[in-house]
């Protein structure tokens, strides 16, 4: 299921090529914010396992579209959680992000709120809930590598917001497999953290891609940090602070779940703010319900 028909079509064609007549695949075009349509999908298929990878994820865009980010990321997740309970799903797995750790932007704060919703549901629901948090996926839509490739192909310059920026990366197969493995081993309510290995300097990545391309004279230009952007992301992979699993790359963060009443109060605050249609009001409401939501300038000042 996808809201974006072109993406759904591409996946459909890729799977048809790979599996041919053996493929039993149904495609549904639906937004998780459209409760009635989503309910029809649940009624039709009675799904056992739901993996929620739906998210507005572009940090600078979401800084100026806070209402839409909350509707899609937060209210959409809440719709899925409620329908999982109503239709007797077995497992719900949510894909989260390192940007949810002490978030400095709307995207990260909405994903932190999603984690709180999932963990709260695990305290009173029948479904086995889990969330898996990891960093950037190499080559995924909208990620930095396709951008650098286009910029190099166009003769440059390659743009880097700040030469100090460091990010965690994982390949698409690694990310997919670890998300599935996390969901499979979940008992209920876990917040899984993946060991992403050593972080990479974006400046080094840009220099290496230029060198490997063989193109001469490509300039790298610093453009300045974008709204909501951190210099460093933090995954919290500190083994002394996490519980181990049988998979050496998957850990469980210790966190306290909110009650059903507490989480619904937070959702009501966000709904009231979003009903105004004002992104600034929505952002302040988000800041009030996600205690760890910090201003990026404060965080970057600490680590600069």
Task: Label the model's feature ranges.
Residues 27, 69, 92, 129-132, ...:
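Hydrophobic/aromatic anchor residues within beta-strands of the central parallel beta-sheet
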Residues 28-29, 71, 162, 222:
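Conserved residues in the N-terminal Rossmann fold of short-chain dehydrogenase/reductase
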Residues 58-59, 64-115, 120-122:
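Conserved Rossmann-fold NAD(P)-dependent oxidoreductase catalytic core, especially the SDR/UDP-sugar
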Residues 115-304:
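Strand-loop microenvironment adjacent to phosphate/nucleotide-handling motifs in alpha/beta enzyme folds
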């Amino acid at each position: 299921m996808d809201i974006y028909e072109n993406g759904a079509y591409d996946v459909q064609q890729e799977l048809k090529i790979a599996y041919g007549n053996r493929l039993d695949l149904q495609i549904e075009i639906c937004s998780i914010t459209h409760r009635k349509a989503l309910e029809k999908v649940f009624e039709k298929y009675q799904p056992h396992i739901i993996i929620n990878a739906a998210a507005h994820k572009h940090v600078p865009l979401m800084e100026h579209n806070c209402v839409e980010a909350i509707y899609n990321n937060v209210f959409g997740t809440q719709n899925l959680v409620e329908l999982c309970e109503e239709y007797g799903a077995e497992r719900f797995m949510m894909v989260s992000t390192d940007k949810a750790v002490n978030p400095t932007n709307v995207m990260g704060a909405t994903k932190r709120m999603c984690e709180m919703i999932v963990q709260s549901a695990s305290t009173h629901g029948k479904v086995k809930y889990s969330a898996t948090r990891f960093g950037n996926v190499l080559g995924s839509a909208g990620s930095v590598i396709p951008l650098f490739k286009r910029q190099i192909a166009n003769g440059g310059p390659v743009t880097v917001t700040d030469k100090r920026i460091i990010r965690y990366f994982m390949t698409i197969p690694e990310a997919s497999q670890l998300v599935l493995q996390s969901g499979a081993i979940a008992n209920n309510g876990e917040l899984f953290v993946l060991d992403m290995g050593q972080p990479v300097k974006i400046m080094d990545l840009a220099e290496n891609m230029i060198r490997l391309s063989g193109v001469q004279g490509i300039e790298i230009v610093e453009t300045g940090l974008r709204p909501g952007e951190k210099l460093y992301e933090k995954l919290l992979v500190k083994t002394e602070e996490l519980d181990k699993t049988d998979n050496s790359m998957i850990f469980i963060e210790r966190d306290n779940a909110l009650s059903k009443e507490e989480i619904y109060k937070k959702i009501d605050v966000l709904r009231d703010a979003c009903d105004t249609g004002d992104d600034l009001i929505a952002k302040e409401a988000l800041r009030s319900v996600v205690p760890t939501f910090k201003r990026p300038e404060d965080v970057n000042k600490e680590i600069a």
